[in-house]
Amino acid sequence: MSEFRVAIAGAGLAGLTLARILHRAGIDVSVFERDASIDSRYAGYRVHINSSGTTALHRALEPELWDVFVAASGMPDDSMRVFDDQFRPGPLRDNRDSAGIGRPTDDIPEHLAVCRATARLTLFHGFEEHVFFGHRITGYENVSDTGRVRLLTTEGSVGDFDLLIAADGINSAVRAQRLPEMRVIDLGSRHIAAKVPLTSETMAVLPEDLMCLFAIAKDDAGVGLTFGPLFRSDPGNPIMQRMPAALQEEVRSDYALSIFNITADRCVDDDELFAMTAEELRAYALDRMSGWAPELRTVVEQWDAATIQPLTLRSMVPVPAWDPTNVTMVGDSLHAMSSALGIGANTALRDASELGQRIIDARAAGTPIIDAVGGYEATVRDYGFDAVRASARVGHWVIGHDDIATAGSESARGQ
């Protein structure tokens, strides 16, 4: 009998975490990624990681790499602060809905601030031979005589596998083929995201009250501004000297993720928004904040122009149960959600841990892999789709975007 082989489409956080969990259990796994290299495209900004995420990452990473991850992460004051457009504080936002269900590891706090690009480089280190770049996945074929699945790319097949796992995001071609009934909807919110370098110069002008887990200011007209700082907890740790140069460079800088958000009906149309230069986007945000407190306008003035980009906020719509096969999905390919609760990455990492353990258990027991997939999918339909619904509800209240029950048409803008 041929060796059991797993293919993962997508080398994001969930895909690499799942791959490493399987690899540590001795399972043959290959990851196929559309990008030309691990650092050919900036892989996102700061993300909130809770105990669901840290539990999965602790399972995936060898002890040395776990120490790197912790040293490169931030351990902020865990308050979530709310202000009006005049920078007057309101009640602290309850962060219990953003907590995980894992076991916080090594006395680290429930909430971490993590750079997505740094975490991805950490997961990739030492795993290079299992990740294949330059493969844009277009779908798959079922191979009837072997029961395997053939993974297809723009350049043809990359091989036959016993299990295919889509981890390639909201635009997943695998999910579109596997679950064509699942819709991606536009939540009716437009974002302009940017990094704010946290240097001695910027810290001298930025408000101290923003230095918490997460802060949001909003007016009565559907406009908001968020701020989430990342101060690396131990960037000088000697262990960093044994890491690749790209990873060392990543951890040298602290920054904040700042997002200007506005409801789509109050924003310029998409063609105009997505054609703007970085400085035009900054100017547009400042114009819409013309009456705001100077302390908040300062945040936008400190945006790093090289990182400014417009985004469309989108979500999946949960669907009824389906029968399992040897093709399944994790992360945004299955349950992309509003960013309002900050649990999207954590839900994806929970998927990686949940599915990984079920695959490992099935291989150890000699039980059918489809049973493992079915058990995982039944579970993820509960917690994953609950997260989609909860994030949409909170986003409707906090950001002002549509709830998934009322959201409109599909949108291909932004990721």
Provide a role label for each language-model segment.
Residues S2-A14:
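Beta1/beta-strand and adjacent pyrophosphate-binding region of the FAD-binding site
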Residues S2-F4, N50-P197, E279-R282, L286:
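Conserved N-terminal helical subregion
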Residues S2-F4, W66-A71, S79-D94, S98, ...:
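C-terminal helical "tail/cap" subdomain of flavin- and related membrane-associated enzymes
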Residues A14, S37, N171:
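Conserved Rossmann-like nucleotide-cofactor binding loop
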Residues H23-A43:
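Glycine-rich FAD pyrophosphate-binding loop
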Residues A36-A56:
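Conserved N-terminal glycine-rich FAD pyrophosphate-binding loop of Rossmann-like flavoproteins
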Residues R88-C115, A193-E301:
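Conserved FAD/dinucleotide-binding core of flavoprotein oxidoreductases
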Residues P310-V330, H335:
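FAD-binding beta-loop-beta segment adjacent to the flavin cofactor pocket
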